[in-house]
Amino acid sequence: MKEQKQSGRLTDTITPLPFKGVIFDMDGTLIVSTESDYFAWKKIFTNYGKKLSYEDYQPLLGIRSANVIKEYIGITGEEDVKRILKEKFDYFVELITANPIKPVEAAEAFLKSLQSHPVKVALATSSRKEKMQMVLQQLNFLQYFDAIVTGDEVENSKPAPDIFLKAAERLGLSAKDCMVVEDGPIGVAAAKNAKMKCVAIAETHRADKLHQADVVIDSYENADFIEICQKLASSP
């Protein structure tokens, strides 16, 4: 994670920002991982006598992996779940070793732009810690975050608000002072359940599937943080 210092960060001296913290989801929001994740899950489902089409996979996005195993594969024993989690992770590693993860277009530029504003930045991902570390180290993205929360650190997965509330807590901020950046309906619902304003990026889902978000953007290309803040602040 980035060093805890503010000396190199500019501040907004004209109009105070309506938010003190920005909380990002990871998969689909910052990194392009859906295809690799789908094929890893498809192999797991096949191994345990289940089928998984891409259409059936999409509603799983944002759900903690252990919950997918319990609720969709039907295996609930804790040791079995741990074993399958490792199998899935190993498949995922194989896939991204052959085809390295890429960032969502212009995501890094947007993260860098936040360094020009007096805001803290957190990552709140349903992914397990080992996956998060591997992917963000590969992309050199850890430097952009003041706090990180992974799916194995909270009791309830999205759409429960736990992960975003924990991220706000680690930033030392209240929920009302934080905005969330998400890419999926389940994540947007979690942000709203946390009573946080949410901007959704239409990367893995069509804009009409993200209607619960306060603001929807097509991409980070030309996305202006101040303008987004103003739109969020004026939304109902």
Regions found by a protein language model. Give the residues of each.
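Conserved SAM-binding loop
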Residues: 30, 103, 121-125, 156, ...
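Residue-level detector of anion-binding/catalytic polar loops
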Residues: 51, 120, 197
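Short, flexible loop segments at the rims of nucleotide/cofactor-binding pockets, characterized by
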Residues: 97-102, 126, 193-195
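Asp-based, Mg2+/Mn2+-dependent phosphohydrolase catalytic module
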Residues: 2-20, 112-115, 128-236
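N-terminal helical cap/lid subdomain that shapes the substrate entry/recognition surface
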Residues: 4, 8, 15-109, 113-117, ...
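Conserved short-loop catalytic and cofactor-binding motifs
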Residues: 29, 56-57, 95-98, 120, ...
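Small/polar loops that bind or transfer phosphate-bearing groups
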Residues: 32-33, 60-61, 123-124, 182, ...
